[in-house]
A protein has these predicted regions:
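Histidine- and acidic-residue-rich, metal-dependent catalytic cores
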Residues: 2-265
């Protein structure tokens, strides 16, 4: 089945952004800006084509377990705030969800280690030398947007960004990554990520990529996304997944082939 993986990932990012905005008070379209920044940095490092597409997928899904994490804390009677997030648990949940994606072997560790600092002070105590490069790029992009709310840009803000990166060079971020930023993300590129235009900016940065996936893979991917949506509220619980399963069952009952049943799911 021809399946636009990036299209589905970017659609899911809107739901994830809504949750992250609630909890962390980050600006909307956060996931897409993290993807844009990661792609620009990755391209400057020499990645291209499918490698950039994989990086974008990991970047846009870097906080995919946030809804699940919030739901787990809710069951324990705990409220979730930015200061109460246990980064290690949140990252482990997210990495587990990424395992079903067909390009997982290319992005292994990107979500798990995206909160690691270059000096080894992150949740898993990994230094830059021990952290996958995709995770390092996503970490910088994530922290940058969280700190500066890059939904708006100005010369003054851009200068503050460069100063902040220099201040955190070698501690939060590896010099090999921070030193690329000014060339990889000039102010003109940052301005294209403002507000709703970030969606167009992201589309322009990525190649069109719609590979064939077997039905089992498509169902596995869809199951993860259904879980993410369902964890958004205790009222929905397993609602999306339940509807999908019943739709596929009805298709089989009426004699549809597995391709049609997968599309129904």
């Amino acid at each position: 089945m021809k399946f636009s993986m990036n299209g589905m990932l970017f659609a899911m990012s809107s739901a994830l952004d809504a949750v992250e905005s609630e909890i962390f008070d980050v600006a909307t379209f956060h996931s897409k800006r993290v993807a844009c920044l990661s792609i620009l940095l990755g391209a400057k490092m020499g990645y291209s084509g499918e490698a950039l597409s994989d990086l974008a997928g990991a970047a846009v899904m870097h906080d995919n377990a946030l809804t699940e994490y919030v739901a787990a804390r809710r069951l324990l009677g705990n409220q979730t705030t930015a200061s109460s997030i246990e980064l290690g648990s949140h990252c482990e949940m997210g990495e587990r969800n990424m395992c079903v994606l067909p390009f997982y072997d290319h992005i292994k560790g990107a979500v798990l280690y995206h909160h690691e600092n270059a000096d080894g002070s992150g949740p898993f105590r990994k230094t830059a030398a021990e952290t996958p490069m995709y995770a390092q790029l996503i970490h910088l992009a994530d922290q940058l947007d969280n700190s500066f709310h890059l939904n708006t840009m100005s010369p003054g803000k851009y200068a503050s960004v460069l100063a902040w990166l220099e201040e955190n060079r070698g501690t939060q971020f590896a010099p090999a990554v921070t030193d690329l930023f000014a060339d990889a993300v000039p102010i003109e590129a940052a301005e294209k990520m403002e507000g709703t235009q970030v969606s167009s900016a992201l589309s322009a940065l990525l190649p069109v990529y719609t590979p064939d996936y077997d039905n089992e893979t498509v169902v596995s991917i869809s199951t993860v996304f259904a879980r993410i949506v369902d964890f958004k509220s205790h009222f929905t619980s397993t609602h999306s997944l339940g509807i999908a399963e019943k739709a596929a069952e009805m298709g089989r009952y009426y004699g549809e082939n597995e391709d049609i049943c997968t599309r129904l799911f």
